[in-house]
């Protein structure tokens, strides 16, 4: 028989990216600002257990070989914190709200900030941790969440550091490692 090669990746090495989109139904009573607060730091840092990894860099202005290995295949492609786009000016938190059910009860959280995973365990952790975080936010909208000063910069900082020792700035003026953010959540 003929040899067949199957690739599961999230970027083509030429500046194009595609990923695994997730969708969550969230109680419409939870203000969208609270949804953003609940998930922003999580989406930036969950790559420590759910990133697919890749060799090289595709961040505009950086040489491909400037990063030998990174945690997430998609991190180099995010340019905005929040927005509607999915193919240009990609946001960490997408605002597309098409719940395909009763829109007076639920909103759709359309997630594009995630890698397609080969590992079933990574997929489980990615989806389950996000679902639990959203459920906690619905139960306690006043719950304190870690807030990053520059999430767009932080998502690439975290990805470009497979040692998990890089620190990112918080909104409060301190610094924290990605793994510490996940422990806080």
Predicted regions and their residues:
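Long, low-complexity C-terminal extensions of enzymes
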Residues: 184-185
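Loop-rich catalytic cores of soluble enzymes, especially ATP-dependent carboxylate-amine ligases
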Residues: 5-7, 11-13, 18-179
